[in-house]
Structure formats: structure tokens, C-alpha cells
């Protein structure tokens, strides 16, 4: 039904307008008690065998919504209603900003992919923090907060900008993510270099500890798939050295070659980060490399090209404790998370692993032993 609706309606709409239309419907459904109860019962069944502990948090399962869909924390209950086990909001910047000029979001339907150059459009850390503080949750879910650099802030002042967001948002976050990997903010990816990343992450960690004294807010970093292998290793080593809680692999790619893309040049020529199915192989490769480097010392989150339960299962076997999706949600619709959960439960039941935690990294460990 959804795929027919997508072809007849959403496909004919501007992608950003379609996003906001769907967003409004989700938020509306979550506000109506009878409707949200019915939708959650249908789309968010719980599988006790998928219960997950990660980052010191207990979750219904390993599958969450990646950052970028709910930038301003306005639909957390709506996305939980659709079955996502954790919701990562953002990216949120220190100051409010409109993002890049439209048109800035493109569907590559033939490739089941998206290209975006949104540019961190969001209401800013103060407004998002106020909304989170005022939130009266309907569904118990884990909320991550993804923070990035305000566009007008010079690279040299990036740490102070991230600290501003941390001070505003840390108290309302179950975990924090430092995003240094979006291709749509000039100079941002330069912060992935360890000489820049070390002081930035140290400053954010100190700010989080200063701001929230009653608990330790888990801190993760999100990296790009375009990093060279030696740079992936360097970030992994730095994360362990600094005592980070996790790494999210990966963000969107600026690459177009070698991905087997079928879309025409009018789409492939658009600048921005590409997400979705074509990202699958490289994201899995980066994740496997990270797990081989860090093992179980920190939590790994797999994202990029997660279309179905098999994709999610392969990320878990590669080393991901948590898995996230976004682009495939656009193509699969409201049954996306339910299908992932059902498929994961089936795969675990027929696997040699007694628990989901036992499956994490099993394939990468097996390859290392050969």
C-alpha cells in the first residue's frame, strides 16, 4: 500500500515537501491517544530476544532512527510509535540556521538513494533544548542528540560552538553525538583529522561532565565513509584513548564513482551527501574495520544502506551493537522498523547465537581467526 502511495503521490512531490507532509501526519497520529495506541500495537511489537543494552542504556531493540529526519526534536513520540528503538535527533547547531538554499534534497529512486545538501537546517541548541525540557513523553524511548558546527563559525572556533550545544543539550540527551562528517558544512570534515578531533572531543566531554553531574552522558563521534583506511584506524585509536563511548559508521558519501549508480547525470551531478543502498558496502567495510580495531571496548553503531533485516543482521555480525536507518524509511514507509525487527528475531532464532549480544562482531572475529 505505501509503495503504491509513494509512486502515486510522494514521488510526484518535491522531496523536501513530501518529507514535511509525512512528518506532519506522523506527529498528528502521535497526538491522538486511540490512534497512536493502535499504530504502535501494529508497527512496534516488542521482541524480548532483541532487547539491547548499549551505552549503559536499556533499549527495546537495536534498531533506531538516524539523525537527519527529526532535526528539531518535534516527533520523538511519533517515531517511537513507528517502532524505532532509539531516536537520534539533529543535527543541532549552536546557533539557529536556515541551511542551504533550496532545492537541496533529491531522490535517486532507481538507486534507492538520496542526495542531500541540507546544511544543518535547524532551530539551534537553545530552542531544541527548551523543547526537550518541556517534553512529556508518551513512549519510553532512548533519545540521542547529534550536534554539529554552526556554518558561520570559523573552524578555529568550532570547539566553542560544540561546547555551546553540549551545555544546552547534554542534560536532555540519553547520549550525545559529535558530527564531524557531514559534507554540507564547509570545512567540517577537516575536523575528522585526529589533531583537530582530539581537542574538540576533549572539550565536549569536559562540557558534558560539567553540565550533567548526576550521570555520565555517553559520547560518540560520527564519521564519514570517505575516510582512508588509515584514518579510520586513527579515529578508532583516538576514541579508545579518549574513553569515548562509541563511533557511528557512517555518514553520507561524496563519492559517485564505483557505487554502481543507475540514476542519470542530472541527478548524479547534484552536490551533497549520498545516502541509501549504494552506501551499503563501504559502510559495512568501515564498520568491520572499526570492530577489528576496537573490539568490544566501545559501542559501534552501523548506519548506511540498511534496507532490510538482512542488512541489519550483517552489521551486527560485523560489530554493530546498534543499527540505524533513514533513507530506506523514505522508500519502505511505516512498516520499515517492524520488518527489521521481525527479520532480526527470525535470524537470531535460526543462528548459532543464544543472544543478540553474542552475535555482535561474530563474523569479524571469525575472519580475524583465519
Model-predicted segments: where are they?
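An N-cap/entry alpha-helix motif that binds or orients negatively charged groups
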Residues: 2-52, 116, 121, 125-126
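Glycine/Thr-rich beta-alpha phosphate-binding loop at enzyme active sites
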Residues: 36-45, 183-196, 238-296
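Short beta-strand/loop segments at the ligand-binding rim of alpha/beta enzyme cores
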Residues: 56-64, 139-145, 210-227, 292-302
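Catalytic cores of alpha/beta
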Residues: 72-81, 227-240, 292, 296, ...
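Glycine-rich phosphate-binding active-site loops on the catalytic face of alpha/beta enzymes
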Residues: 85-97, 180-182, 246-256, 305-306, ...
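A gly/proline- and charged-residue-enriched helix-loop-helix capping module
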Residues: 90-140
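C-terminal helical cap(s) of enzyme catalytic domains, especially alpha/beta-barrels
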Residues: 96-112, 257-272, 329-353
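Active-site glycine- and acidic-residue-rich loops that bind
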Residues: 150-163, 190, 196, 220-241
Amino acid at each position: 500500500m505505501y509503495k503504491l502511495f509513494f509512486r502515486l503521490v510522494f514521488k510526484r512531490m518535491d522531496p523536501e515537501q513530501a518529507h514535511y507532509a509525512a512528518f506532519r501526519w506522523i506527529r498528528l497520529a502521535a497526538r491522538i491517544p486511540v490512534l497512536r495506541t493502535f499504530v504502535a500495537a501494529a508497527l512496534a511489537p516488542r521482541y524480548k530476544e532483541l532487547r539491547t543494552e548499549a551505552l549503559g542504556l536499556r533499549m527495546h531493540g537495536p534498531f533506531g532512527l538516524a539523525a537527519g529526519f527529526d532535526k528539531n526534536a518535534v516527533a520523538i513520540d511519533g517515531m517511537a510509535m513507528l517502532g524505532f528503538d532509539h531516536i537520534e535527533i539533529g543535527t543541532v547547531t549552536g546557533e539557529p540556521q536556515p541551511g542551504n538554499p533550496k532545492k537541496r534534497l533529491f531522490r535517486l529512486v532507481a538507486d534507492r538513494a538520496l542526495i542531500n545538501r541540507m546544511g544543518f537546517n535547524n532551530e539551534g541548541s537553545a530552542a531544541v533544548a527548551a523543547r526537550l525540557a518541556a517534553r512529556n513523553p508518551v513512549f519510553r524511548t532512548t533519545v540521542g542528540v547529534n550536534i554539529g558546527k554552526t556554518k558561520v563559525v570559523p573552524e578555529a572556533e568550532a570547539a566553542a560552538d560544540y561546547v555551546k550545544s553540549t551545555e544546552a543539550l547534554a542534560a536532555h540527551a540519553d547520549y550525545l553525538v559529535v558530527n564531524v562528517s557531514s559534507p554540507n558544512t564547509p570545512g567540517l570534515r577537516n575536523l575528522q583529522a585526529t589533531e583537530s578531533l582530539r581537542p574538540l572531543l576533549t572539550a565536549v566531554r569536559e562540557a558534558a561532565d560539567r553540565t550533567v553531574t548526576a550521570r555520565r552522558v555517553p559520547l560518540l563521534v560520527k564519521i564519514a565513509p570517505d575516510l582512508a583506511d588509515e584514518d579510520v584506524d586513527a579515529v578508532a585509536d583516538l576514541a579508545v584513548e579518549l574513553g569515548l563511548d562509541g563511533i557511528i559508521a557512517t555518514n553520507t558519501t561524496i563519492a559517485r564513482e564505483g557505487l554502481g549508480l543507475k540514476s542519470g547525470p542530472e541527478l548524479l551531478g547534484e552536490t551533497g551527501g549520498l545516502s541509501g543502498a549504494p552506501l551499503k558496502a563501504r559502510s559495512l567495510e568501515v564498520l568491520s574495520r572499526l570492530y577489528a580495531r576496537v573490539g568490544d571496548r566501545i559501542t559501534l553503531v552501523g548506519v548506511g544502506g540498511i534496507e532490510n533485516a538482512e542488512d541489519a543482521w550483517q552489521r551486527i555480525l560485523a560489530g554493530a551493537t546498534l543499527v540505524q536507518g533513514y533513507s530506506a524509511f523514505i522508500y519502505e514507509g511505516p512498516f520499515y522498523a517492524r520488518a527489521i525487527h521481525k527479520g532480526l528475531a527470525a535470524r537470531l532464532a535460526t543462528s548459532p547465537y543464544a543472544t543478540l549480544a553474542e552475535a555482535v562482531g561474530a563474523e569479524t572475529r571469525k575472519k580475524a581467526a583465519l
